[in-house]
Amino acid sequence: MRQPADGWREQALAEARVHDIDAAEIDYLIEAVTGLDRLRVRLGGPQALEAHREKLAALWRRRIEEAMPLQYLLGTAHWRDLQLQVNPAVLIPRPESEALVDVAVDFCRSCAGARVVDLGTGSGAIAVAVARALPGATVWAVDASEAALVVAGANIERYGLSEQVHLLRGNWFVPLPTQPFDAVLSNPPYIPSAEIAALMPEVRLHEPLSALDGGSDGLDAVRQIIADAARHLRPGGILALEVMAGQGPTVVQLLARDSRYGCIRTVRDWAGIERIVVTYAWARGS
């Protein structure tokens, strides 16, 4: 016997509680599939969902049985004021990464024709957000993954930024042109290898390992970026790195030991966690 649409929603709510899933995901799924927000669903009664019942049930079943993130199931993620294409080739953009964009935009507003680098661009979220906030800036978005660059390219095209954001394939600074940049930004892999197995299944099973695993202490990529960034920054340019909770003091120490950098500070995210480490390049290093 076919389950009525309103019965499906009640069952989904019960399953969400059992699997420790935020009930808001159900309304997010409903709105994405039907175009109806929670109020319109309530006003429309059971018939509001009936035409979409089978699709809703199938997607929710995958959410439960495969621990598949809803953003991957739907192919989109809402972040800042953006609706971004995503798939398992890229990380799902997190709210904490918004602080990285804010740092870049605040600094680059005073730079005429700002030149910004986004290392490990993934979905292109940071590059797109910075470019939209700074119409006069040029952004170079770098990633080693061809599959990730396809996703980033779709998001750049979606927001009409193809002339402003340049995609480059390669490891970190390797594919960049030889010119000084105003800002180098990165949300690199920063989770210690030993902690990967303890991640939530939504992350561990579906998000790209190469974008998560930061080596034994989580800072392999951070060290490499610090080593190379100074020679790509203009004097007074900034390096801004997103880090894991608790890594801030160690990254500050790494930068403090490098004479090419100064004025090191940390920026807290929306949850009050030291999430971004920012430093200035004293001079272009060798």
Swiss-Prot record:
Catalysis: reaction(s): L-glutaminyl-[peptide chain release factor] + S-adenosyl-L-methionine = N(5)-methyl-L-glutaminyl-[peptide chain release factor] + S-adenosyl-L-homocysteine + H(+)
InterPro entries: DNA_methylase_N6_adenine_CS, HemK-like, PrmC_N, RF_glutamine_MTase_cyano, RF_methyltr_PrmC, SAM-dependent_MTases_sf, Small_mtfrase_dom
Pfam families: MTS (PF05175), PrmC_N (PF17827)
Residues annotated for substrate binding in this entry: 187-190
UniProt cross-references to SUPFAM superfamilies, sorted A to Z: S-adenosyl-L-methionine-dependent methyltransferases (SSF53335)
Keywords associated with the record: Methyltransferase, S-adenosyl-L-methionine, Transferase
EC number: 2.1.1.297
Source taxon at top rank: Bacteria
Family per similarity comment: Belongs to the protein N5-glutamine methyltransferase family. PrmC subfamily.
A molecular function GO annotation: protein-(glutamine-N5) methyltransferase activity
Keyword Repeat carried by entry: no
Name by which UniProt lists this protein: Release factor glutamine methyltransferase
Record organism: Gloeobacter violaceus (strain ATCC 29082 / PCC 7421)
One record GO biological process: translational termination
Residue positions binding S-adenosyl-L-methionine: 120-124, 143, 172, 187
Known function: Methylates the class 1 translation termination release factors RF1/PrfA and RF2/PrfB on the glutamine residue of the universally conserved GGQ motif.
Keyword Hydrolase: no
